[in-house]
Amino acid sequence: GLGDVYKRQEFYLDEKAISEELRSYMEELARLTPKLTVRKSTEGAEHVPLVRVLRSDGSDSGLAFHGVPGGHEFTSFIMGLYNVAGPGQALDGETMGRIKALDAPTDMQIFVSLSCTMCPELVIAAQHIAALNPNVRAEAYDLNHFPALKETYNVMSVPCLVLNGEKVLFGKKSISQLLDTLEQQEQKSRTSDRPEG
């Protein structure tokens, strides 16, 4: 069952009430699932509270959730754990090949609300890619708790995807559509890095 594939979690807190909510949420989840261990970290982390998904050896998987992964994002969170633990959700060979071929460092920030029904598809797709490719990070944010980020990226609706802190895209995407976007982004950065002559 799913209980056999849970991995470790690390959570970062501050003094806000949402941090206390995250702490009790994660501790309760760990009580219900013996294969899941959580540890609180005080090392500097941006945009707290957050939960990082760690591999069984304690290394960072590139997956994180900023806020409390409840509401519609509970499923995304569980699928993230499942995909990091391996073998994860089944993918066809072509999709797996496309994921493995991504070689540029890519940072995906996915802004969501817990009541959004279209957000989980994008979060699951992004985190599935990150779980399989160490060059990719996928961090979801409950936008209600991060108004400064909402303003920085002028987020008008969710889901909202920010690539490498620059490119802002709105709307849900399947894993195939997201790979199209990431491949175009890589192609564009390769072209712009090429010396003129």
Please state what every model-predicted region is:
Residues R55-P87, V162-G197:
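Non-catalytic, surface beta->alpha helical segment in thiol-disulfide oxidoreductase systems
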Residues G1-Y6:
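Short, small-residue-biased leader/transition segments that mark boundaries at the very start
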Residues E43-L63, P147-N164:
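Structural micro-motif
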Residues P87-L102, D193-P195:
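Long, charged amphipathic helices and adjacent flexible linkers at domain junctions
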